[in-house]
Amino acid sequence: MDTITVVENVFGEVERKVQKSYWEEHSKDLTVESMMLDSRAKDLDKEERPEVLAILPSYAGKTVLELGAGIGRFTGELAKEAGHVIALDFIDSVIKKNEEINGDIYKNITFMCADVTSPELKIEDNSVDIVFSNWLLMYLNDEEVEKLIGRIVKWLKPGGHIFIRESCFHQSGDSKRKVNPTHYREPRFYTKVFKECHSYDQEGNSFELSLVTSKCIGAYVKSKKNQNQICWLWEKVKCTEDKGFQRFLDNVQYKSTGILRYERVFGEGYVSTGGFETTKEFVDKLDLKAGQKVLDVGCGIGGGDFYMAETYDVHVLGIDLSINMVSFAIERAIGRSCSVEFEVADCTTKEYAENTFDVIYSRDTILHIQDKPALFRNFFKWLKPGGKVLISDYCRSPGTPSEEFAAYIKQRGYDLHDVKTYGKMLEDAGFHDVVAEDRTDQFLRVLERELGETEKNKEAFLADFTQEDYDDIVNGWSAKLKRSSAGEQKWGLFIATK
């Protein structure tokens, strides 16, 4: 055994002793308050438990492995529909309390006292449909997290799912603690570990984890204005060459450095045309009222959502397909104490109940969507009667685009329409009082200002970014100016009412 392995083992043993001591201290009272480390636990539990369960895929008749099961807040709920639940916790008194609460009611639960980091924990490969973990990885060190995720992927059947929920950045509960060994990590740590995890079966097939969704727990946003409760749902899939549109966004168009350089141009918190200036102008048209609910489709890094929530006291749900965008948005939310939650989601597959939102807002995003009529029908369904939709988006002039513009559209994967046709699609979806404005003149003024500021502040830009980054921005903005000045690329503003 080499020196590094010995040191890792020693640190691992110390970590486990510290964590076990911590939870033995907080498990003297086997109550929901002690498990959630919060005096308001009962109220929070009523709100968040159904929210968490609603994120899960169907577990009817399935095998569910619950890691860190505690006294069974979720165990009984899972057992109502699952074929078999394996409930595991490393504190003996806690798992016994779980069995006392749920064992007589549900005969499909196996209760286990075990440490998830122990090599003695044996779960058969490809035997589990869903692994469920609510506040667990934050009590493991980084190496333990990586090793456990590697084991979980092997335990899962192909097509199986992992749900994890963690406290990120800082403590949420108000319980007094003598010591607190919890690892309050940035969400991107967990995302990176899951994205980089691979496993192989006996036939040599390679499997990876594909993100289904990631979001703030809404109950904590509503009750505490706290965005640090983050959950992820991953699916075990066979590795393929085609990584899909989400990977394209995160690895090509919206890499982390790309997002930051866009923000440098658009202004802090913004990655769409005009930044704060156009956001304020457009949002002011919505006549927002305190307590209303807004859906932001393609929320980016959250600047517009923070503005709406802080200025008008509305609740905003921001969704974006880019993991990188949402990661930045959640990080920027910390400490703001506003009612904004974020979720990685595909607006073309996401479902909401009818009459959920007062406003649907989208800035320069729907250009990515190929089937706009279907999306607009969903917008109409999701809005309350009298609700409004506001969209700004890239458009094009009527007729056939030039070869150069057509190549640009294809390379970006855009679906562009002329302003009139765009407005007609909203009318066809059922909307009334449709305003479809050609805002290309404003677009040109904004582009010229943004390009001018970038060139004027070249030295400061190059202190934080590369020459290639600078050239990409200058060339990209110059090309947009050329296409728009020639009348090919347009920018539209659309407002409509249900």
From Swiss-Prot:
GO terms for biological process, alphabetical: methylation; phosphatidylcholine biosynthetic process
Gene Ontology MF terms in the entry: N-methyltransferase activity; phosphoethanolamine N-methyltransferase activity
Any Pfam family the entry gives: Methyltransf_31
UniProt entry keywords in alphabetical sequence: Methyltransferase, Transferase
Biological role stated in the UniProt entry: Involved in phosphocholine biosynthesis. Catalyzes the N-methylation of phosphoethanolamine, phosphomonomethylethanolamine and phosphodimethylethanolamine, the three methylation steps required to convert phosphoethanolamine to phosphocholine (PC).
Positions that bind S-adenosyl-L-homocysteine: G68, R73, D89, D115, V116, N134, V271, S272, G298, D320, D346, C347, R363
Binding site for phosphocholine: S167, S172, G173, R177, Y184, Y262, Y394, Y408, R412, Y414, K480
Name of the protein in question: Phosphoethanolamine N-methyltransferase 1
Reaction(s) this enzyme catalyzes, per UniProt: phosphoethanolamine + S-adenosyl-L-methionine = N-methylethanolamine phosphate + S-adenosyl-L-homocysteine + H(+); N-methylethanolamine phosphate + S-adenosyl-L-methionine = N,N-dimethylethanolamine phosphate + S-adenosyl-L-homocysteine + H(+); N,N-dimethylethanolamine phosphate + S-adenosyl-L-methionine = phosphocholine + S-adenosyl-L-homocysteine + H(+)
Domain of life where this protein originates: Eukaryota
SUPFAM superfamilies: S-adenosyl-L-methionine-dependent methyltransferases
Outcome following mutation: G68D: Abolishes catalytic activity
Pathway: Phospholipid metabolism; phosphatidylcholine biosynthesis; phosphocholine from phosphoethanolamine: step 1/1
EC code: 2.1.1.103
Up-regulation conditions: Induction by cold stress, salt stress and abscisic acid (ABA).
Gene3D superfamilies: Vaccinia Virus protein VP39
